[in-house]
Amino acid sequence: MWCTWALGRVVLAVVFLVALAAGDAAPPKVHRNHGKFTAGPWKQAHATFYGGRDGSGTLDGACGYKDTSKEGYGVQTVAVSTPLFGAGAGCGACYEVKCVDSPDGCKVGAAPLVVTATNLCPPNPGQSNDNGGWCNPPREHFDLSMPAFLQIAQEKAGIVPISYRRVPCVKVGGIRYTITGNPYFNLVMVSNVGGAGDVAGLSVKGNKRVKWTPLKRNWGQEWQTSEVLTGESLTFRVMTGDHRKATSWHVLPPDWQFGVTYQATKNFN
């Protein structure tokens, strides 16, 4: 009887040690992109246009992007009104828009267009909401880049009624990160984000001293931290507006440089 009890103790100890060893050998937990961002309901609004026929005058703006043509957004972009901009939280969101109910303004047979929010259409309190103050709150308005507008509407129309909805952002390649500033004040630009497209949270971790550190939104999609990040391989964790997370492990090498864009291998769906 004693032998049976002792043998049981030995077996349990062995099982415990094996489990402990397996736990030590297990890889670190990775935040994965579970599921996909799904399109939202159709809503009604109006659209105007700004910039030149080649997209000039629309390549930067209130979201902090420096050149949308090089950051994964092209010229299929839109400056949205304050309710959609959300103090920068709406930057990077993708919308499907189509011209409706304007036989003289809509382009016949035009397919719906997908654009990315990259700028703010500021309010014009000196004009009424239905006569020049198109972007005055609480209006949800789309000031499209001229190349985008001309795909669905006639230039002479100036303003057209549209139907729109949020859709998944389909991007080529992984999420991109660009750090500017100096060792004691880092501004991190996050771009080329798929899925929901917008960024609601960002954290960084180094491979040496820097533990997981949340960044604060500076403006648009520029995120700031005073943590000294130089000399370490950096991992970023992005949370989009639908609360999905993706971790870009060691996307910046230990000798990363300010002003250089680094691209992860993965993105949101």
Curated annotation (Swiss-Prot):
The protein's matches in CDD domains, at most eight in alphabetical order, are given as: DPBB_EXPA_N (cd22274)
What topology does the record note for this protein and the membrane?
Peripheral membrane protein
UniProt xrefs under SUPFAM superfamilies = Barwin-like endoglucanases (SSF50685), PHL pollen allergen (SSF49590)
Which taxonomic lineage does the organism of this UniProt entry have? Eukaryota, Viridiplantae, Streptophyta, Embryophyta, Tracheophyta
Q: Which family does it belong to?
A: Belongs to the expansin family. Expansin A subfamily.
One of the Pfam families matching this protein, by short name: DPBB_1
* Subcellular location(s) per record: Secreted, Cell wall; Membrane
Q: Which domain of life is it from?
A: Eukaryota
> What is the protein name given in its UniProt record?
Expansin-A32
Classify the main location.
secreted
Q: Which organism is it from?
A: Oryza sativa subsp. japonica
**Keyword Secreted recorded:** yes
Query: Residue ranges of the Expansin-like EG45 domain?
Result: 60-174
Q: Please give the SMART domains that the UniProt record associates with this protein.
A: DPBB_1
According to the entry, every stretch annotated as the Expansin-like CBD domain falls at 184-264
* Signal peptide annotation: 1-25
Q: Which UniProt keywords apply?
A: Cell wall, Cell wall biogenesis/degradation, Membrane, Secreted, Signal
Kindly state one GO CC term assigned in the UniProt record. Answer: extracellular region
Its biological purpose is as follows: May cause loosening and extension of plant cell walls by disrupting non-covalent bonding between cellulose microfibrils and matrix glucans. No enzymatic activity has been found. May be required for rapid internodal elongation in deepwater rice during submergence.
Q: Which GO terms describe its biological process?
A: plant-type cell wall loosening
